[in-house]
C-alpha cells in the first residue's frame, strides 16, 4: 500500500533499494558493466566488490587454511568482516596435468610430505581429503555461497608455485611453463566447471604478466583469445583483464584497445604495493602525489569519463604487513586508502591467510607465516583488528549513480583512521561514520572557503594550535573558517591563523587525537617544513564528492 506522504519518485527508489537489499545476501545474479561501474544485471543497481584474496594456486592445489579451520568458519569470517567477495587463486596445472587431475587432495599432500597439514584437514574438513582438486574447489566455493560471498576465480600461475619473479617461467605467453594453448584449455575447463555456480561472478585471466617476452601486441592477441574462451564457456561471468609489468601498466590500451563484442562483461585490474618506493625516506606528500599520479596514468585512466571506452577497474591486489612494523607499508597505506576512497574502486585485499601449507620458495617450506594475511599464523584470531576496521568505509559504495543521482555533497575521509569528519554534540568535531547524516558537508576543495555542515548554517573553525576544532555560525570570518587544500598531495586542509607573533600560520585539521579532531600547525606542506621523522599523515583528509544522501534517507 502506497503512503500518501511518499512521492512516486521516492517510492520507486525505495522499491529499487529493497530489491538491492534482498539480492545482496545471496549475490546470485549475474553482473555486468555500465561505463566504469559494475552493476546487477537484474536491477541495474551498482554492486561494489570489496574482496579479499584467498590463495589456492600453490603446490598443494587447495585453498589455504583448511587444516586450521572448517571451511564454513572461514567463509563466515570473511562475510562477518564486511568482505562480500573472494578472489580465489588457482593454477592451470590443477586442471591440465595428471599429477593433479588424477590425484585426490590426500594423495597430493602425501606426495609433498604434508602429514601434519593433512591431519589438520582430516580434523577440520575431512570431506575434502578424498576429493579431487577441482571438486575441493567446488566445495570451497559452495561454502562461500552459503555465507553470501561472491567469488572471482583468478588464474594466478600455470605451474603451481609462488608468484611472482621475472624469470620464474610463469610470467608471459611462451615462457617455460606458460604454454598459451594449455592456458586457454585450462581457462575453458574452469569456466565450464563453474558454469552453473551463481556466486562465481567473474574470472580473472592471469595474474601479473611480466618478463622479457612482454609486448602489448602479444598481450592483446592472447588476452582477447582467453577472454573469448571464457565467455563462450560461461557467458554470465565478468572477464577481468590484467596489464603488463606485474599488473601495473595498461597504458597501451588507447592505441591498442580491446575489441571484444561483449564489452559489458569486460573489467580491468591493477596492483599497487609499496615495493621499491621511498615512502619512509621521501617527502610524504610528494611521494603520495607522484605514486598516485603514476597509477592514474598507467592504470587508473580506464575509469575516466573522458575515456570513450571507460570500464570498471578492479584493484585486485594491495596490502601491507599487518603487524604495522613496516614504515614503508604504513605510509603507503594511507595514500592508497585515500585513492581507493576518492575513486570508489572495486578492490581485493592481499591477503586472508596467516600461513601456507607449503611454500617452496621459503624456509621453512611448511607452515610459512604470511604477515600480509588478516588471520594470524595459526588462524586462531584476526591479526590486526584496527587494520580491518580501517577498511569498513571503503567496503561500502561511496558513489551510487544509478540509485541516487543527487543531490551531491562531500564527505571528508581520514585514511589513517578509516573514518570521516563528523559534527558532534554541541559544537564538537570528531572522527565518525562516513554514513552519518552529520558527516555530510558542503565544501568546494578547488577554492578557499568554509566547510559547512549540510542543512545547517554551521561550519568548521579552528581555535588555534593544539586546540579542538569546533563548529561555528560565523562562517564569513577572513581567517579560522576559510579552508584550502594546502599540500602537493591535496590531502591537508588548512586555514590561516594569526599567531601571537603577528604572523599568519597555516593550521590544519589533525586526527592524531582520534576521535577528537584538533587543529595543529600544518606539517610538511613545503620541503622546508618537513624535516626527518615528521609525518603529516594524521593530517591527511580526502574531500570526496558523493551522492549517497538519498540512499541513506530511504534506509531511515
Curated annotation (Swiss-Prot):
Its EC number is 3.2.1.-. GO terms for molecular function: hydrolase activity, hydrolyzing O-glycosyl compounds. The keyword Chloroplast does not apply. Keywords: Allergen, Carbohydrate metabolism, Glycoprotein, Glycosidase, Hydrolase, Signal. Residues 1-28 form the signal peptide. May have glycosyl hydrolase activity. PANTHER family: CELLULASE FAMILY PROTEIN (AFU_ORTHOLOGUE AFUA_5G14560). This is Glycosyl hydrolase 5 family protein. It comes from Chamaecyparis obtusa.
